[in-house]
Amino acid sequence: MKRTIKYLSFLGLIPFLSITTISCVKQAKENNNKNQLISQFKQLIFILNSFDLDNKKLESKIIKAIEKSDFNKISNINLELTIKFLTRIKNELETKTISQLNKNDKLDILTKIKVHLGSLNLIELVNIVDELVNKLNQKEEIKNTHKDKIEKNKDNIEDIDDSKLEILESKYIPNQHNYPDYVKNFKTVSAEEIYKELYDRTFSIKFLVKLKDGGLLSNGTGTGWLLDYHKYSNTNKYKMFIATNLHVLADFSNSLTDEQNKEFNYYDPSGNKVIGLGLGKADNVTDFSRKNNNSKSENNIANYYLNNQDFENYLKNDFWSVNKFSKGISEPKIVFGAVDFMKDRAIKNHYEALQKEAINYYNYKKNNNEINDDNKIAWNNFLNNKDIPIMIDFAVFEFDVDLDLVDYNLKSWISNAISGLDNYLDRLNKAPILPNQDKKISKYLQTTDYVSALFKKDKSEQNLYNAKDIYIAGYPTSQYSRSVWMQNNPIERNSSTLTSNWRSPTNDKTFAFANEVEEKAGTGLNFNIHDNYWHRVFATFYGYQYNINFSSLYYGASGSLAYNEFGQMIGIYNNVKSNVEFGDLLQSATIAPFLQSDNIKVGDNIIYAYNLIDGTDKTKYKYQKSSFRENLQKLYPNGFSDGLKSTKLFDDIFN
């Protein structure tokens, strides 16, 4: 009986098991169907990628969003309806390119996708579509701003025909550590003479800024040197023109009138204003011989003269250097900054790339909480007007000094700087022949730069395209925050056994500049975006920069003048590797040249000729709109306060 009962009980389970089995099979079919539907959501990758071709991370973002989404709460019917819609969109996009659609068509498609995804509560995917909508609106805004800018400057843009310009083709040329035979025609100048001249012309510089709220700020030091001067008539007074890096003048704000600041595009929207100048120098430096690398000597420390007593009070707790007020120095003013110095025609092909890079950088900083009170002003200014000027790291400021009102020490500094520039010009004048310099065109500067010489088919035997030795000296900041006089080219630079650069021969055979260059405005358009100059957003850099060996002067030396071995000034020191330590001089750095004498085609773009010091020859520098000399003409239309129109470099700033 028990066995029967067991049997019956088993038989009684059969219908139940059958029902359960059927239910599981049905559930499995539903799950498989849902999984297939979910997999079809990956059509979104193709669709959304069509709207943002440049976003390499979009595919992985969509996949992650799909994996995170809870599809179990969505009915198969709703999934099927959405997938049918996505399939239709995908098929349409496969038959036409996204470029055939106008902005409204694109927004319409994205909005419908967003509505479908929103109805399924797929929030992660909705957010991705939202990002694309915002990007699309930004791109359209950039294009419209670009069109407005072109229309506004139509005359400026259309007045030049590239077909009438001589244009050089850039090409890859390996580093060259040798000179052509005709180099023997040029006479070199001793290292000691060059370093002495650099010392005389060079100063450590710092500035005092009055903040909009009434506070004061002095932020770091740099290096500057005497580019030019004007001697006032019947007096012992001079106007000194000091060249340095634009980044050294990052807080050098609103020194001109409001109208001039806007005219030159030098305004700082923060409302801050530079009011103080600290002019520094290491006294009694007489030894200009080479030193061992990593010597880290702090014997030649700069002390400073200040133009106002507020600056002296501000620095009263600075125990590392002497800071002394002198009533003979005026308030400094900017004369030229190499920002927005090319006509719009020269950069019109870069405009969209610049806007895109700036917006990407802004979004990166915003997402990483790197927007602070200072750069917020810069980004608000950019977002309001979409202006992003291209710059080179070069600037000139001026101050007046009355030698009758200064002490003996400062008087000797100024007199020696003036003598240093005079000696430089006298030596060039007496040289029978100089490389890359037609003295009929310029008495003070090369007329053909190294890069143009490299790409030219020039058989004149007048031009060099590399430099065996380059001399740079300035005031890097030591680990104790002291500005110390220091020269490049340590003793190891001439070692016949040491190789400091793995791509080069031994140091004694390595050229300081072996035609290794960098550019940002040609192939790739990979500009660097900065938000810390004058509370503005700028892009670097126009033209070329030279990579220089044995010249890794530490921070604070920014702005130093660079000579070649023939005693010609060729550029300004502006960048060094971030891992360099104070005193290590064997690494590489960069200088920005003062000119590019020829138009050079790089990829699909042309980098047009410019001369930062004198761009007045518009047969040569057609696309340039400002330079040091041109700004002098605008700042002093009637000459200087004594009525004269001459400087040491220019007999007449107008002719």
Swiss-Prot record:
Please list which residues make up the signal peptide. Answer: 1-23
Compartments reported by the entry: Cell membrane
In this record, residues modified by a lipid of the kind S-diacylglycerol cysteine are 24
What superkingdom heads the lineage? Bacteria
One Gene Ontology term, aspect cellular component: plasma membrane
Q: Which UniProt keywords apply?
A: Cell membrane, Lipoprotein, Membrane, Palmitate, Signal
- Record's PROSITE patterns? PROKAR_LIPOPROTEIN
**Which InterPro entries has this protein been placed in?**
Mycoplasma_peptidase_DUF31, Uncharacterised_MG067
- Can you locate the N-palmitoyl cysteine lipid attachment residues? 24
Q: How does it sit in the membrane?
A: Lipid-anchor
Q: Name one Pfam family in it.
A: Mycop_pep_DUF31
This protein's major location comes to: membrane
Entry's family note: Belongs to the MG067/MG068/MG395 family.
Q: What is this protein called?
A: Uncharacterized lipoprotein MCAP_0231
Organism of origin:
Mycoplasma capricolum subsp. capricolum (strain California kid / ATCC 27343 / NCTC 10154)
